[in-house]
Amino acid sequence: MGTKYKFLNPSGIYFISFAVVDWIDVFTRNKYKDIIVESLRYCFEKKGMVLFAWCIMTSHVHLIFGVKGNIKHSDLIRDFKKFTSKAIINAIIHNTQESRKEWMLEKFVKARTNKTNISGYQFWQHDNLPIEVFTPSVIACSKIL
């Protein structure tokens, strides 16, 4: 198994990018962006995320982050993506003013077709493409949160 896109350094600081399936522009609505922001805040305050920079684009998210404590980078991102996926899809389902609701939900169902490990909807693409960017001592002075 290759190591090109893995979190190899437990104390490393990584740039990752993860996108909505089919690059759907979900984050044009503040309601859905707020779920990402609140989830990042929770990960920072409760789960050991050290967040240096983040950017929410219309269809994807960029993070520069590390971890403290016993949590692994991959476990943190797995949990973040799992929670935000469910929360955003639930928000879409219950948003009576979402004009793209049926179209988006259909895309999320189609994205999980033929994938045995996913039931319901697939919101995020599977890859994160982590790239270790700096050592902790280099970036410590520019921490955002």
Show which residues each predicted segment covers:
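Short catalytic/metal-binding and nucleic-acid-binding patches
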Residues: 1-145
